[in-house]
């Protein structure tokens, strides 16, 4: 889901020498009520100050998204955006509540999180993953294990 903290960081980023790229994937039905205080719709996110300043991109996946659909969406939208942005560092808010077995209704597999780790590692830049979401210990263990295992 959209994070107000990410948007605040973008809004306060200096325009010189630093570019931030916030790409988030919101899982859930498009007409679902917003459950998080201060959450915004994808349409509320802007382009920022251009090449030298903050940039915000949003991408929303449907409810009950599968691994295959996630991979297809990554290939069509995320990979080209990352390639054109050429980050020097990736800080990933790794929301695990999109995994099958969690309460959100998504059907991402541990393999999906391993895929994300490999894709970001393939950029050849440092990455920092901050674990967010995910409430069932067995699901967390499988997804974190898959993500970390893909980095070795």
Question: What do the predicted segments below correspond to?
Answer:
Residues 1-119, 148-149:
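Conserved alpha-helical scaffold segments that buttress catalytic/binding sites
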Residues 63, 133-134:
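Short loop or secondary-structure boundary microenvironments that flank
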Residues 125-133:
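Short acidic/histidine-rich active-site segments
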Residues 134-152:
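C-terminal active-site-proximal or functional interface alpha/beta core segments in diverse enzymes
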